[in-house]
Amino acid sequence: MAKEIKDNRILSVIHPICCGLDVHKGKISACLITTDNAGKEQYEIREVGTFTDELTELREWLLANNCPIVAMESTGIYWRPVHNILEGYLEVILVNARHVKNVPGRKTDIEDSRWLAGLLRVGLVRGSFIPEKEIRHWRELGRSRKKYSQSLGDYKRRVHKVFETANIKIDTVVSDLFGVTGRNLIELLCTEEAEISIEKIEQCAKGSLRSKVAELHRSIQGFFEEHHRFLIMSLMRMIAIIETEMALISERMKGLMRSYEETLERLDAVPGINEVSAQYVLSELGPTLKDFANSGALASWAGLCPGNNESAGKRKSGKSPVRKHVLKAIMIEIAWAAVKTKRTYYRDKYYRLRSRLGPRKAIVAIAHRILKALFAIIKHGESYRELGEDYLTNKNKKSRVSILRKQAKKLGYDLVPATPT
């Protein structure tokens, strides 16, 4: 007869030796947990600084105690110096601070490290995605370019503002003030102090704007004084600097991603994606997606899928989590570009969803679908296949006909197929 054995342990120990780190800018509290032969845990606390030599001492202490794994909160960028020292020597688990909150009333640095170590010991922490070093370099370049792009937009808006205050209305005639014609006119305004003749306007106008020379001439008749000239020249110099830096970063990224040109080309074939956004996507995800089991896991990580919120058997609001995720912002931009591309599946699907969900939820749904396609392209090497704007119409034709028959019957009519002529 089998003998019943009572197990008094509430949770199984996953990591008998582990460490929790409470990381700050200038100080780290470390709690090392070890387990003796009797299965009893022992705690050792240390506080160290964040200079490289101090972090190296921390690493050597952990290795001397045969610690294979550490956990720390993703506090700003303060975890990066620690990760730089420990990477390649120990397994580093980066956890979301919201997921490992300590018990109220026990909030000290040492207690936080002990709490984190305790959670790690029994496997109650979930690590964040930390890409490889090469991919992290791509990320930093891509995010720097994104910041430059945002700054560029700010400076361009300031140019528009200065022109508006000076009664200069070029942007009412020219769709892009910073296109060839627009820049020519800006340069003309900044270099010509005398009254500008219509002949000089003709020299500035390019393409279809040559037929609007008279309107362009009227648009610059304002109160453009030396004060406005100085401001515009200052702003244009900053715009030129930012554009140069963005071009240098793009070339740098292109060189680093040269081994993955084929993947970038396949990404570029997706509606809404160009060369730059393809680089953004690859820099955020990496070229293998080995850390994501399926497209659903990727969408969840990016904050582009509904959350689970169920209580007492009832499903409550499952809206996407409010998360400032870089990839989510990129995918939303791609989705907007995709739905503006005519005769595509995404455009048709967006307008179908918008009538039911509204524009904001609909665009998130499109971003989710595009991300699933990108998963297949990157991980499985598949090529994008455009379904076309009639895909859903043809797919739902039978059900649509059935609905129309019922509607016609209610109105006292019979729906019959059209006779071929």
Tell me what each language-model feature is.
Residues 1-421:
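A detector of single, family-specific signature residues
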